[in-house]
Amino acid sequence: MRREVVVGTRGSRLALAQADWVIDHLRARYPRVSFVRKEIRTTGDNILEVALAKIGDKGLFTKELEQALLHREIDLAVHSMKDLPTGLPEGLVIGAVSVREYPGDVFISRGGERLEELPAGAVLGTSSLRRTAQLLAYRPDLQVIPVRGNVQTRLRKLDEGVVDALVLAWAGLFRLGLTERVTHRIPVAMCLPAVGQGALGIEARADDAEILEMLRTIDHAPTRAAVQAERTLLRRLEGGCQVPVGALGRFRDGRLVLEAVVASLDGTELVRAQESGPADRPEALGNSLAVRLLEMGAGEILARVRAGA
C-alpha cells in the first residue's frame, strides 16, 4: 500500500470542496495513507470572458487534469461528472462515481420572485445552452444572457444587478453551504439536468490497481448505472457538454428510468421522451432512448445548433 496519494482538482472553492469530500471518505477507509491535494488550472478556468459554447467542449475543465494523470503527476482526478466528456483518453477510466446529490437546477432571484413571477423582459443569467433552451420554452418572454465564472462570481453579478435572476445546479450550492440563496428548485419536468449533474466522477489510470481498489470503496453503484445510461445517450446523440441536451436516470420499482430532452437554442423546438430498462443494462437503455429521440427529430435540431454555434 502506497503511503501517499496525490489528488488532482481544479482550484475553485467548489472544486476544492468536492476534492475534500473524496479525500475525507478515502481517509476514513485508509487512515495510514497521506492524501495530498494538488490544484491544476484548466482551459475553462483561464477563459472566462467567452461563452462556453463558443470555446468548444472537448475537456474544457478536465483535459489538464487528465494530462497530469497520464504523466503520473497525480494519482486520481476529481471532476464534476457533468464536465467529464463521454470519451476518455486511452489509459484512463472512471474509477468511482459518487453518490448523487439532488441533480436538478435551482432558481435564484434578487427580489425573491419565482421563475413564473418574473416580469416580461427580465434578465436571466446562465452559462448553459441546455438551461437556456428549456427555460425559454417555458418563458420565451425572458432575456437570457451568459454568465461565466465560479458560483460566488455569478452570485455577485446577481447582487450587483447585472441579472435579475440566476439558474444554477443545486449540488454546487449545497456543497458550498449556500443553499439559503435558493428561491426555489426548478422541477425536472420543466428543466432536465445536464448528464451526470449532481455526481462526482473520480478518474484514474486503468493500470493502477491499487488506486482503483481504493476508489471502489466510494463508488455508488446506483448512481454509476444512472450516469452510465445518461452518458451513453449523450454519446449516441454525438452531443457534448455544450449542447442543449438534458437527461436524468432514476430508479423506480427496481428498474432504471431514463428521461431526456433535446431542444433548439430558442426553445421553440423540443423533443422529450423516456424509457425504462433493467438496472444492469444502462448502456442499452441509453442507446435505445437516443435512437428514439433521433427518430423524433433530435438529430436535425442538434445539427442546426452546431451550424449556428
Swiss-Prot record:
Tell me where in this chain the PTM S-(dipyrrolylmethanemethyl)cysteine is found. Answer: C241
Q: Which GO terms describe its molecular function?
A: hydroxymethylbilane synthase activity
Q: Which InterPro entries match?
A: HemC, Porphobilin_deaminase_cofac_BS, Porphobilin_deaminase_N, Porphobilinogen_deaminase_C, Porphobilinogen_deaminase_C_sf
Q: In which pathway does it act?
A: Porphyrin-containing compound metabolism; protoporphyrin-IX biosynthesis; coproporphyrinogen-III from 5-aminolevulinate: step 2/4
Is Repeat among the key words of this record? no
Highest taxon above the source species: Bacteria
Question: Can you quote the record's cofactor note?
Answer: Binds 1 dipyrromethane group covalently.
Q: Which cofactor does it need?
A: dipyrromethane
Write down the top EC class of this protein.
transferase
Q: Which UniProt keywords apply?
A: Porphyrin biosynthesis, Transferase
What reaction does this enzyme carry out catalytically? 4 porphobilinogen + H2O = hydroxymethylbilane + 4 NH4(+)
Q: Which GO terms describe its cellular component?
A: cytoplasm
Q: What is its EC number?
A: 2.5.1.61
Any Gene Ontology biological process: protoporphyrinogen IX biosynthetic process
NCBIfam families for the chain: hemC (TIGR00212)
Spell out the note in the miscellaneous section.
The porphobilinogen subunits are added to the dipyrromethane group.
- Could you tell me what this protein does? Tetrapolymerization of the monopyrrole PBG into the hydroxymethylbilane pre-uroporphyrinogen in several discrete steps.
Its assembly, as annotated, is: Monomer.
What family does this belong to?
A: Belongs to the HMBS family.
Q: What is this protein called?
A: Porphobilinogen deaminase
